[in-house]
């Protein structure tokens, strides 16, 4: 149905129209999930937790200097090279579906999505690219106003591969 809607003449007219705004947009979910996963795969320092042992959330993504990833974390670029469905599998772990919202505990999946991507979106190189991509997509859709929802200290969580942390002023 989604494809039918997106290819309809009415949808193309609506796409060109100016929009109001997006309110309460979470900073770590403002971008395209496919783009984020592909960007992570392009960075050899991005890892994903692959075990289902309860010690770390399966699918949690993080950035580590080469050779320092804790047990259970595997390089995303290596997994993607071996599995043609890797991107789809990861996107499903970080995206809410209608089935998730109908489940008895939809907040569990919602919170897990944020936990899975948090290690990526606050890694400075990805953060910069992620926001650029996010705002370019919003501008292309004629969104006029964006209200970002950032928790206290959220922009203080920015870091780089050398272990440097950045202040909220530097993050913004």
Question: How does the language model describe each region?
Answer:
Residues 1-172:
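Metal-cofactor-binding active-site regions of metalloenzymes
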């Amino acid at each position: 149905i989604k494809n039918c809607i997106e290819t309809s003449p009415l949808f193309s007219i609506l796409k060109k129209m100016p929009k109001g705004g997006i309110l309460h947009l979470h900073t770590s979910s403002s971008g395209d999930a496919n783009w984020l996963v592909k960007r992570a795969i392009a960075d050899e320092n991005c890892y994903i937790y692959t075990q289902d042992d309860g010690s770390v959330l399966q699918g949690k993504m993080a950035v580590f200097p080469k050779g320092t990833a804790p047990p259970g974390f595997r390089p995303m670029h290596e997994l993607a090279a071996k599995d043609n469905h890797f991107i789809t599998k990861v996107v499903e772990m970080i995206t809410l579906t209608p089935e998730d919202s109908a489940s008895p505990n939809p907040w569990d999946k919602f919170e897990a999505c944020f936990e899975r991507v948090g290690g990526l979106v606050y890694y400075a190189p990805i953060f910069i690219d992620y926001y650029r991509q996010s705002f370019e997509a919003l501008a292309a859709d004629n969104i006029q106003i964006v209200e970002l929802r950032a928790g206290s200290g959220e922009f203080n969580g920015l870091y780089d591969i050398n272990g440097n942390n950045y202040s909220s002023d530097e993050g913004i």
